[in-house]
């Protein structure tokens, strides 16, 4: 069996990236990459970020496009990690079609709540609010849904075990460290996720029957044909089966298993026989237990080893009490000489091979 090459081992070791998660990260790179890596700083504000002045000019497309906008290479890197971590897990849970649907819903409603907060802030003269940009509001919405509906009561955050309901709020505080990220938009996304997780937005859900129909339509049918990425079906039964295969993989499915042939162990066998010559048990070499004298209830009992230094030689040992009783059922003492191994036999010659018999006292 030939071992797979380095390229195949590399692809086997790479984690599977869901389709919609990959294309979300790709769109973020295509939208923000040219501005960040081709233009000289200082950069002008992006025409795709979310602000209230843009909606007054009927630029409603900004309600969606702001999640692909990043104004800093560090924020772009953080956004890619957030997309891979949170969006990827959410897509594996709900499927690719519903992931795209909820991404759109969370994006639009987070933007609406953010604009409402911004209007209140401007009317109250509380200060200028930073423009909403990046995927973090949608990620917090997905995190809010997961934290509410998860069966886990505790989670590990930064090496500390905390209740699961506190995880979104702790990560919300940590989002201050991401450069040029609107904290208000993150709060808006988290509120949307918690509202949906508590079934206050059940009317916005997408049924499984509709998701299965959309699986066969464009562009999802095209995404399904791409072998490099994992398309998650809209069927909950298929997702559970895939999760079961991940938890209980078939033998040989891991690269470390498939690189080596399966060897069947061939251990020398120590045979335990009655006077009728029937095989009862086997021991691997070097693990032969000490066999004290024992008088079994069924009469004479021998352990014959045919794998000594000479293949034609054999040696016979008296069987131990635990071995004899563990192999054959208990027999009454009043019936000596009876073999209780499922077959009737009479004491006689054990074969053409020479063997020494030690009579049990």
Swiss-Prot record:
GO cellular component, as recorded:
Golgi apparatus; Golgi membrane; nucleoplasm; perinuclear region of cytoplasm
Name a Pfam family for this protein.
Answer: Rhomboid
Q: Could you tell me which residues belong to the region Disordered?
A: 265-287, 318-361
Give the result of residue 197 to L, as annotated.
Answer: No effect on cis-Golgi localization
The family note in this entry says: Belongs to the peptidase S54 family.
Source organism of this protein record: Mus musculus (Mouse)
Residues making up the signal peptide according to the UniProt record? none
UniProt-listed Gene3D superfamilies? Rhomboid-like (1.20.1540.10)
Q: In which tissues is it expressed?
A: Widely expressed, including in retina and brain (at protein level), as well as in kidney, testis and ovary. Expressed in all layers of the retina, including inner segments of photoreceptor cells and ganglion cells (at protein level).
Topology within the bilayer: Multi-pass membrane protein
Per the record, the gene is: Rhbdd2
> Which residue intervals are annotated with compositional bias (Polar residues) in the record?
267-276, 318-328
> Keyword set for this entry?
Golgi apparatus, Membrane, Transmembrane, Transmembrane helix
* Segments traversing the membrane: 19-39, 63-83, 100-120, 158-178, 182-202
Q: Where in the cell is it found?
A: Golgi apparatus, cis-Golgi network membrane
Alphabetically, the GO molecular function entries are: serine-type endopeptidase activity
Q: How does it assemble?
A: Might form homotrimers; these trimers are only formed in retina.
Annotated protein name in UniProt: Rhomboid domain-containing protein 2
